[in-house]
Amino acid sequence: MSKKNKKFFRNDDATFAWQNGYINNNKINSNKPSIYDHISLDQSSGKNFLSKSLIPNYNFEDIYDTDKYSNKNKNKNENNIINKKTNNKYNNENENINYTNEIPSINRELNSIITSTVGLSNLGNTCFMNTCLQNLIHSEDFIKRLLTKKSSISRATPISYYFFNLCKELANSTRAVSPNKLKEKFGQKHLLFAGYGQNDTQEFCRVLLEDMNNELNEVKKKKPYVELKTSGKSKIQCDKEFDENFRGRESSIVMDSFYGQIINIFTCKCGFKDYSFQKVLDLPLLLQTSDMVSIDDLLEEYFEEEEIKFETKCEKCGKKRVHKKEVKFSQPPNILILSLQRINNRTKRKNTCYVTFPEILDINKFIDVDCGHAKETQYILYGIGNHSGTINFGHYYAYVKLNDKYWYEFNDSMVRRISGGINTRSNTAYTLFYKKRI
């Protein structure tokens, strides 16, 4: 990556956005604080790792509604479009979810959901939501886990309840489904998403998964937080202790599918190493160039070793020194979400540089083998969230690969098969969904 272009999106810009961004329906940035207070930033560097983090959303005004351009006035076979309209079979709010008698096999039920080619109605600038939902609903590992826990889903877990209802509607409908119930409940809980203003698909995805993670948390009696002591312990022991301590407070199918574990390695000049760990839901990858860049380049930059700018006291030599910091996966996730940070919230500019991404992603060099997870780790691309246009006039849509074979475009209510596959060199790719290769 050319150094002369790194000023395009500086790391301190990202820090400013994460710390100060607050979006309403009319402004991109204001001085109001974020509605979430659990952002965890490591400000020892420009890398700004996020633990269970949220990045502010960015409003896109005047979004066109693809429902206005549906096929009802066109030839039904034109351009391989699958035109769907709303089916209310599962909209009865007075019934708890119980599909035991409907589909006897989880695998059959799973297949009917993840192979669905049914669109979602645009309720008015809700393409950001539909794009995220289609990628999540076609996430095999997650949906399979969800089906095994469906007995625990009820009105007491409203976000999970309406998400699962939506999955079932898509699996059993031949017409586009309205996500209005999920949208309504989500907006009641998060005022930022109330109404029909446009929002950011990455933030919506994080908040949605956070909600379901909290609702489906299987820990009834949480253990008190215990600070991890790493002195004299091996990496594998520290990694295990952190994970067990964390899961003593939070453990859910969302965590099992989407969360990875990061190890931060701090090295003193005397050679002493100290460790810290954190759970991550996705990897926010900064675009610091206007030139074409590869996902491998962005991951190299995310995980590169760096020097901490402030001095800390070494536990071994007792001296206050600048430490070096290295970051790797100690436990890679089953589903890896890569969030391309195309929008600079500070300058209100969108980076439209081309990004190349492989359909098979190898991340072995970003895994710490000393943590006991040294298996060869490759990921298969199965979902893409795209954003076309500008900040003030743009649109979200999804690409999803079905049966590991054919790619489909999910553009709100419109769904079509992409002949010849997708282009893995794109200036619209915004979020990439990879599943671990088994």
Ranges and model annotations:
Residues M1-K32, Y36:
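N-terminal intrinsically disordered, low-complexity regulatory segments of eukaryotic proteins
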Residues N5-K7, Q19-G21, D37-D42, G46-N48, ...:
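Exposed substrate/partner-binding surface patches
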Residues N20, N26-N31, D67-N101:
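Asparagine/serine/threonine-enriched low-complexity, disordered tracts
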Residues N96-G232, I335-L340, R417-S426, F433-R437:
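USP/UBP deubiquitinase core
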Residues L120, Q261, E307-F310:
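Residue-level signal for mature regions of secreted extracellular proteins and peptides
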Residues L228-R247:
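Intrinsically disordered, low-complexity regulatory segments in eukaryotic proteins
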Residues I253-D256:
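Short, recurring structural edge motifs at helix starts
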Residues N264-F266, T312:
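Cys/His-enriched microdomains
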